[in-house]
A protein has these predicted regions:
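Nucleotide-state-sensitive switch-loop elements of NTP-binding domains
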Residues: 2-8, 13, 17-131
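Conserved short-loop catalytic and cofactor-binding motifs
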Residues: 60, 88, 152, 240-241
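Phosphate/Mg2+-binding loops and adjacent switch elements
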Residues: 86-181, 185
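C-terminal accessory "lid"/substrate-recognition subdomains
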Residues: 147, 155-295, 305-310, 314-322
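Flexible loop/N-cap segments at domain edges
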Residues: 302
Length: 322
């Protein structure tokens, strides 16, 4: 039987970093799988989680509950066929967990999986942003939590800590809250039992151009690069995919990220020095360079305001070395 955990949290709370930490701590001899869903259509998290020792399935372009849950069911069934010891599911930061939890609790899956605790990540700084606090998905993700992971503790100031303490006092029902940084949590948390509770019914609006496929975007024919857009739930995503022959200037690329002034940027890019992984939430920019190159370059922006994508694209194209 496969043990299953839902890993939720709003945009930029550190879900992918936490997944990387958990996969690095995977016990020897165990087989793990990851089902990852993204709001955009480029498929960044799949590239970030590649080569982590787990079977990976991506569902890009919306939330797992869309299209009557068909992408979720197909992806879940494909992973369960290999009978992994554990399955970690990461829905989009703009997704609602209710339908996913209902599906995982359905009688048809009871012989195949054991649903364990839902872990919801929270950055205390998010509590200072009225737009985030008022967001339906943000509230409902926290309502679904069995354990709340207060992440990015190293970035908080005293006001953030006081705001988190005040929020925790008002939390109903009371649930464990664990403070951490870089998504570092004990592996034992995954074995915490799931607590079934009544969750709010979501009223979010799905994007009109929602993708129902089960694979991240690919290049067509002789195309060197392409762009993909997605809209919904008050946010827009714009992503770019470049072929393996395209290299980027790492300094110019990081400057482009700094100047973009958007809510979220994630990317895995080919540079002259190797693979550059980029993760930027507001003004928090993290990057690392690895020697092994990815098969292509992918970068994506998510923003809540109207954005001149053509201007950003023009500046991004100027970062290419070839």
């Amino acid at each position: 039987m496969t043990h299953v955990n839902l890993i939720t949290g709003f945009l930029g709370s550190g879900k992918t970093t936490l997944l990387c930490h958990l996969l690095a701590a995977r016990p020897a001899g165990e087989t793990w799988a990851v089902l990852v869903n993204e709001f955009g259509e480029i498929g960044i998290d799949g590239a970030l989680l590649a080569d982590r020792g787990a079977t990976l399935k991506e569902i890009p372009g919306g939330c797992l509950c869309c299209v009557n849950g068909l992408p979720m069911q197909v992806g879940l069934n494909m992973l369960l066929k290999s009978n992994p010891d554990r399955l970690l599911i990461e829905p989009t930061g703009l997704g609602h967990p209710r339908q996913v939890l209902e599906m995982l609790s359905a009688p048809v899956y009871q012989a195949w999986l054991q649903l364990n605790a839902t872990l919801t990540l929270l950055d205390a700084r998010q509590l200072a942003d009225p737009r985030i606090v008022a967001n339906e998905n943000f509230r409902d993700q926290l309502a679904a939590a069995d354990i709340i992971i207060a992440n990015k503790r190293d970035c908080w100031d005293e006001e953030d800590r006081l705001r988190l303490a005040d929020w925790q006092q008002q939390m109903q029902p009371l649930r464990p809250l664990i403070e951490t940084e870089f998504g570092q949590i004990p592996l034992s948390l995954l074995d915490t039992p799931y607590q079934s509770r009544e969750l709010p019914v979501p009223h979010h609006h799905h994007p009109a151009n929602h993708a129902s496929g089960l694979a991240a975007l690919r290049l067509d024919g002789e195309a060197r690069w392409r762009r993909a857009l997605n809209h919904g739930q008050g946010y827009s995503a714009c992503g770019w995919l470049f072929d393996a022959d395209t290299l980027f200037d790492s300094d110019a690329l990081l400057e482009w990220v700094r100047q973009a002034q958007v809510d979220r940027i994630k990317g895995v890019m080919r540079t002259a020095e190797g693979t550059m992984r980029i993760n930027c939430q507001a003004k928090d920019l993290q990057s690392e360079t690895l020697t092994s190159p990815p098969p292509d370059s992918r970068i994506e922006i998510i923003h809540s305001q109207q954005t001149d994508w053509n201007r950003l694209q023009s500046a991004l194209l100027k970062c290419r070395l070839r």
